[in-house]
Amino acid sequence: MKSSMSFPRATALAGAAALAGLAAITVSPATAAPAKSSAAVSCSSTLKIAMVTPLTGGASFLGVEQLSWAKYAVKTLAPKLGLKIKLVTGDTPVEQGPAPAQTVAQKYVADKTVVGVIGPSTSGAVAASSKTYFQAGIAHVSPSATRTTLTKGDNQEATKAFFRVVPADDIQGPTDAKYMIDTLKVKNVVVIDFQEPYSLGLAGEVEKNLKAAGVTTSHQSIDNKVTDFSPYVTNVPAAADIVFFPTQKPGDAQAFASQLAEQGKKAKVFGGDGSNDSSAFKAAGSYVSNFAPDITGIPADASIIAGWKKDNPGKTVGSFGPPSYGATQVMLTAIKNACKAGKGKIVKRAAVIAAVRKVTIPNWILGGTFSWSKTDTNDPAGAKFYIFQIQSDGTYKLVG
């Protein structure tokens, strides 16, 4: 099956300010317990949910795509649920580290009409802000944060108010490594990290699985702000089959692949979900993995796709938008159920956390029925990753 989807997570670098952006649409009809809100909120009033994602900087394409699908979900689903919802946005540029995520979280904690958050979209932003949201009783449902230790392990970086609708890197890493071992028959792999949470977690999972299978590996650690990769390309062994390159900036994956070719190296780039952008990463023969299938092949999604395209003329269905629609659907359903339980009021924002945990969605946008894992990690049940190879025309073909 071929896919010509745009698979993004970051393109052009731009050093933008870390202030929370405010864009809105209005639609009419674990540990210690989270803190109570100061006052109940009437469900007949306009409630706010916040989309927290990179809208500027190198990963802006991620946020722009996610926001378009969250807007469409609010527009089409909120009236059916009898809700009046205003969608606001908070910008978390990946180049600026944890500060923007913390600033945005404090802003929305202070606004008592914000009853839920879609995001944060990146693992670093989740780690930086989840405690703040939890202490205020705010559920936050990410459509794309995959770092394993956000929800698993002895030192979890997120709280029980955090949920994600996509699988974690402990699924992505083994999936990527298994494909390299079983299908590509690799003998020598270079693994790179970019000294930030997303790449460190994914690189670690891949390297662990490759080593367990007896594959020769070497490791390079690159600052996330580096743009000239030539010294690192020089250090790629001539015998290397693959360079595993888990960036959040697909343009960097393209640059690295181009420099490999310029230096006569045979290795191909294999990116994680952060590299999925066919407009920026188009080096033929390279590979990417992603947590979303091509939803254009799911018959039940036809009307959703048609409606989204009508609202976004000329845009291509990508891999990051549909999970954002799904995360928004989960949040809206939880808000509706919390309102019902509170007899027309959200007595405390933490009621939405409890409601999120009980959500199931039939005819899920990514296929099948959505539900939470029974492992109490707030991860989705039965989720998987997909492998794509970049073709000579720049399209992404599903290969695993």
Q: PLM features: what roles do these ranges have?
A:
Residues 16-22:
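Sec-dependent N-terminal signal peptides of Gram-positive bacterial secreted proteins and lipoproteins
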Residues 2-16, 31-400:
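Extracytosolic ligand-binding ectodomains
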